[in-house]
């Protein structure tokens, strides 16, 4: 349980509550969560130790054209890590559902509406793309880059979050490598529902012990935080205990409510090169 679970800013969220689905456009459905809740807990100041974004894929995006003919699309959203707020995912789903019976004059109007509303919620300009479904018909399913660290012959008997697994986890050998794990699992901060993800860690610096890194990632298994907060915690813990020269942490979470969230945090990169889904997405 995190220190801010009972924060006042979380009490008004529709997440975890029975809600009515709206079918006509209602931007007020979007709800913001201050990023400061998690960042204060991590003792991060105004100068963030990372850049990056939250990449969302919108698989259930539909509206009516001026003739009343339904349109369907896949949307991609990039929410800057520097924005004061993240967008709460259930409210995002409810907001997108409000497009379903709403007429828009063009696809451009849909995109402009998404940019306007999401930017207002996040507190910073959000990048949005709206694509025809056909664009995704040939999109490959990919694996994460680098070596997978999951197939280790180790015994795990503790599933409580513990950043100390990363203590004394580096050797003197200097290396630049990319590792990934599909064993990332945490729980929703509000509902306790499981969140399933894969995480890619690219770093340059002293070599990180793979067993200790895997034990650390598995320790999120009973941990309650939003996707974005977990990734920022992973980034700051690796920086604290391993002190790499450069670091990028990219997690891709499985889809829920027609949305997947893919937080990306880096010492030097603003966004991932591609938004390509994994097998579980």
Swiss-Prot record:
Belongs to the GTP cyclohydrolase I family. QueF type 2 subfamily. Substrate binds at residues 87-89, 227-228. Signal peptide: none annotated. GO terms for biological process: queuosine biosynthetic process; tRNA modification. Pfam families: QueF, QueF_N. PANTHER family: NADPH-DEPENDENT 7-CYANO-7-DEAZAGUANINE REDUCTASE. NADPH binds at residues 89-90, 256-257. GO terms for molecular function: preQ1 synthase activity. Keywords: Cytoplasm, NADP, Oxidoreductase, Queuosine biosynthesis. It is found in: Cytoplasm. HAMAP family: QueF_type2 (MF_00817). This is NADPH-dependent 7-cyano-7-deazaguanine reductase. It catalyses: 7-aminomethyl-7-carbaguanine + 2 NADP(+) = 7-cyano-7-deazaguanine + 2 NADPH + 3 H(+). Its main location: cytoplasm. It is an enzyme of class 1 (oxidoreductase). Gene3D superfamilies: 3.30.1130.10. The active site is at residues 188, 195. Disulfide bonds: none annotated. Its EC number is 1.7.1.13. Coiled coil: none annotated. Pathway: tRNA modification; tRNA-queuosine biosynthesis. Homodimer. One of its GO terms (cellular component) is cytoplasm. Transmembrane segments: none annotated. Catalyzes the NADPH-dependent reduction of 7-cyano-7-deazaguanine (preQ0) to 7-aminomethyl-7-deazaguanine (preQ1).
